[in-house]
């Protein structure tokens, strides 16, 4: 059954393809589609990143030491791994010894464990993993080591006051493109090093920057043309063995990151296999990269199985809080890294804010995901009873135990008047017969660089009759097949919503598949409703 309200922007029924596409661009507010799709000249001067000149000077001083060694301290997510790989490959290309250190689980920032072993490095470069206090940085200085920080998170007042001494280069500090990811900042740093040192290395590392931008859900909309241009360059210049091993092609698109690379890294984080995810981007051997992809795929399947088992318990927990506007789920600490995945599944299923936490010394900590709310993080942070860090409706959360009951009461009071049925904005309303190869080509061009602030093209098709219901992969996936098109939902489990005979109305992304020489139009359904065919009783 339909889970959302649909708001269609363009009724394209009866229109030729070019008119449909023109109306689409108008609805998205894009005045010059050609320069938007193929951006050139939008890379901002690296000098606009504060402290980049000082950081580069520190880098060069260390590089010119006898037998220099750098340690790169990486965040655990795809943006962090990409950032580390950019620096690692740059350093090895100029013949400098480099080692990458990565945290365990989903930890962020320099941790005490880093100091248990002296690696005899001259310089520590922290990428995409900034701390909230000076304590760890002072330890690095106390050991006589130089420090550089490349980041994109908003620093707090203490860090901001010390930005110059920290050699902090961040897109979050007065930079015209605050949406630039950690990998984007790192790429611009090595691009700057190319400029001042007369090398030419960074352009063949831009694919890593593109991966980080898409994976970290940074804007690729008209408000960040620099990000779009980095993706434009990176998608067409695949040099990294790990990226090529995943996408198995000479070029990639945003979907390659969102549905392939990102999920593999995320699964490794949740299953405490961060080093393997990092190695995917560090290796320069394609055969090794292919084996890592196989290993990561196996880890992802293990994660999926474990999450499914845990999610079964959520059904019971919901029975005790059905009248709540926000659902709470407690998991064992050993499964804490799965909190984000489980919260996503829960909010998608029950269409409301969902909080998944485990018991920690700080209190109840974990993840929240929300739908039907403009900014759930702001609601949490305004309570004074808990704290969110992350995006508006996708963030980490900490609630002191002594505040938990009061926190729940406060959240409930803030959500009382809200309708949690999400509004799905649909780009185009079309008939099935309008899904031609020419239209699909245009849609693919648009979707090549898509993501935050510029989502892929969505289409509504209604009144689909004479279909056949198929269960794919032993009932894991739904396929509604008509003579000219397939409508698909991956990992489907709501079979009670399926009607064998009726009328289907669907919203989703359109594409085409090729199998045994046959081309088939398809839609990956984001939302749908089956309207049963009324039964007619004969009267005589």
Residue ranges and their predicted role:
Residues 1, 186-188, 373, 535-540:
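Nucleic-acid-binding small beta-barrel platforms of the OB/S1 family
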Residues 2-123, 141-145, 194-412, 423, ...:
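Hydrophobic helix-and-loop "lid/oligomerization" segment in the mid-to-C-terminal part
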Residues 86-94, 100-183:
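Hydrophobic, small-residue-rich alpha-helical packing segments that form membrane-like cores
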Residues 158-215:
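Short alpha-helices
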Residues 403-408, 471, 500-540:
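OB-fold single-stranded nucleic acid-binding module
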Residues 417, 421-423:
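Non-transmembrane, aqueous-exposed alpha-helical and coiled segments at domain scale
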Residues 428-485:
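Accessory interdomain/linker segments of ATP-dependent helicases and helicase-like nucleic-acid enzymes
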Residues 483-498:
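Beta-strand/loop nucleic-acid-binding surfaces
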